Amino acid sequence: MTLQEEIIKELGVKPIIDPKEEIRVSVDFLKDYLKKYPFIKSFVLGISGGQDSSLAGRLAQIAIEEMRQETADASYKFVAVRLPFGVQADEEDAQRALAFIKPDVSLAVNIKAAVEGQVAALNEAGVEVSDFNKGNIKARQRMITQYAVAGQYQGAVLGTDHAAENITGFFTKFGDGGADLLPLFRLNKRQGKALLAELGADPAIYEKVPTADLEEGKPGLADEIALGVTYNDIDDYTEGKVISEDAKAKIEAWWNKTQHKRHLPISIFDDFWK
């Protein structure tokens, strides 16, 4: 088995999907979790305005609405959380996403004071915080906030990790990589777009240039520039297609470099890293 085949098997990506069928798979997955753990009464998700959170958010809202209808339990809620750092340049995109998702509850928590306070405390202790490191602090603060909200709403936190992101490790460890459920796992970027189109999303949501937007020195830096490879190549790779040797080498280098992000903390019984 080639490395490409091993990766595809681990990520569970299908070369061809039926968007309507995959929507039902994700919705049922979320509902099954609620049925298994009846003390969980909500799903919580941070909404950035990009493709991934828009899709995960809409799927979660559908699942919650179906649970309310099937159980007659009005306490089930989907909570969407805006998590800007100061004034968010793409706030209009976030509002467009919220209009599409139609969440039961919409909150906004500005993380700037918390992040700046953490950086100041580190500086006071003699620790210099690089722009890159501060970006990771932002991602982790956003998850701290979502788990606090989940505590209020008896909720589980959703993540937006998908195959095209997972393969490159393009997420912050214990930041946006930390969640309870991943309804998009198994889908690559273009498949996520197909689901959004099937759900009737404004094309502006899934045509937006993907960016983590964590570094202040590189505002709006496109994911593809940061990775050095296009999502089209990543998607082709995860679908088992032949791509250029250069793109293939970059993707596989990211996979190998970020293995630690796809595992729980390493114990003496783990050997994937050796």
From Swiss-Prot:
Q: Which residues bind ATP?
A: 46-53, 160, 189, 211
Gene3D superfamilies, alphabetically?
HUPs
The cross-references to SUPFAM superfamilies, in alphabetical order and at most eight, read: Adenine nucleotide alpha hydrolases-like
Annotated GO molecular function terms are: ATP binding; glutaminase activity; metal ion binding; NAD+ synthase (glutamine-hydrolyzing) activity; NAD+ synthase activity
This protein's GO cellular component annotations are: cytoplasm
Catalytically driven reaction(s): deamido-NAD(+) + NH4(+) + ATP = AMP + diphosphate + NAD(+) + H(+)
Tell me which Pfam families the record gives: NAD_synthase
What biological processes does GO assign it? NAD biosynthetic process
Similarity annotation: Belongs to the NAD synthetase family.
The protein depicted here goes by the name NH(3)-dependent NAD(+) synthetase
The organism is Lactococcus lactis subsp. cremoris (strain SK11)
